[in-house]
Amino acid sequence: MPAGTKEQIECPLKGVTLLNSPRYNKDTAFTPEERQKFEISSRLPPIVETLQQQVDRCYDQYKAIGDEPLQKNLYLSQLSVTNQTLFYALISQHLIEMIPIIYTPTEGDAIKQFSDIYRYPEGCYLDIDHNDLSYIKQQLSEFGKSDSVEYIIITDSEGILGIGDQGVGGVLISVAKGHLMTLCAGLDPNRFLPIVLDVGTNNETHRKNHQYMGLRKDRVRGEQYDSFLDNVIKAIREVFPEAFIHFEDFGLANAKRILDHYRPDIACFNDDIQGTGAVALAAIIGALHVTKSPLTEQRIMIFGAGTAGVGIANQIVAGMVTDGLSLDKARGNLFMIDRCGLLLERHAKIATDGQKPFLKKDSDFKEVPSGDINLESAIALVKPTILLGCSGQPGKFTEKAIREMSKHVERPIIFPISNPTTLMEAKPDQIDKWSDGKALIATGSPLPPLNRNGKKYVISQCNNALLYPALGVACVLSRCKLLSDGMLKAASDALATVPRSLFAADEALLPDLNNAREISRHIVFAVLKQAVSEGMSTVDLPKDDAKLKEWIIEREWNPEYKPFV
């Protein structure tokens, strides 16, 4: 990762080619000398502006769009392929306002309408009809030399942002996640590659759309799918051997098995499984600082046992194991509820591979009449200290369920983290009322504070952007051999223990994304230290803590214009 300094850089372009390069274009900020040298003096208005003047103009243009999120998304996307420095400078100054525009929820609309509103190519498109290792390597080599790419986000678009199978349009989720890597943690955007794997789509709306730009066939599965993915991973390892691989928004049937398959051998990560789990764990750790009770003594019930729910469960288990529990005892503290109720051994035939380690013995619940055990009954039986919602089913955390839980726990920890807000299992004000103001609450979407006994109570957001960018940058900086459970736990612990000055309020369980860069530095530092202690780092990092912190900052990419030579 190049140092974020003011050094001069060599510009290989000139004329209109330079002005059309988002990497090198400065628009009206080119100096008179640069305009002359690079043959663009007649192509720009005579005034020379600062980056801040450009940011101010763009923000005025952005506000003039009005209350049309998708149009704002398109405006910012156009800016990103015109002048990336200006794009990142603008958003970094309005981060909280613009993240919902460039990421969830608005990016979901852009993805759904990808083929209808397509304007310019972004990212790398690999399709299963060209499942040949040599050809895939040739495609990847179009994006640079072996050291040109250090971070890759790859999706097959089956599980996009809660909106499901989006086919080729899923490339935009890889693009958006990369933007957050740069904004929140300083990843060099010129060394990041977003990839979409087009393996067909089962989305009939897209396949029937005459504008659709992807493969018009059923989503491929089985051996052909696995062969294609394996060739893609092999090609990445050969063309960009030092690149860290980030799997994003794969479907329930593939996400965990793919991660389990590749994780022992290559440096890789799945944000939906590990990132979501690590952020939820950080929020739990934050809540446990309030209750002053250890993670290893918690009884945790997860409502919704899909990719996110299982990912959170596995991350909590890993955290408990790191804190000293055996694997079996840690899993014994997790209780999963899915469409068939509390998951028991009798559900083994219909349980996914990810759910099976959490099946409880039927004999442990023999006093329950035959039939499925619903949430309210399960709470009465298990008496959980923590309740997490990942189901996408609004209203499922009922008053009866919350009051039952509050009977057994002095400060119940309740996180309805399904996105968007319309799919939350309960609203924070309902949880607050039904728990008599005792619950510690976090959500998956940004929400205003509660009024609790005349005081403002901040609702923390379990936002993956708080963690995955820093985790990814730490993996890049260390060129880690693998991403270990210890490194993930270090990230969760670091997020939960950043300086309180970075929190929106004293009672907040997680820090404020407004302070993304400072939060990320704290996490990067902790993960690097853990990587070194486990022998996972292949880079000789500074051993002095103060020097390591300086080293991290020096390697951040920042949106600033540098002199050209």
UniProtKB/Swiss-Prot annotation:
Active site: Y103 (proton donor), K177 (proton acceptor)
A GO cellular component annotation in the UniProt record: cytosol
SUPFAM superfamilies: Aminoacid dehydrogenase-like, N-terminal domain, NAD(P)-binding Rossmann-fold domains
Pfam families reported in the protein's UniProt record: malic (PF00390), Malic_M (PF03949)
Site (Important for activity): D272
Statement: the UniProt record of this protein carries the keyword Oxidoreductase: yes
GO BP of this protein: malate metabolic process; pyruvate metabolic process
Cofactors that this protein relies on: Mg(2+); Mn(2+)
Annotated protein name in UniProt: NAD-dependent malic enzyme
Residues found modified as Phosphoserine: S445
Gene: mae2
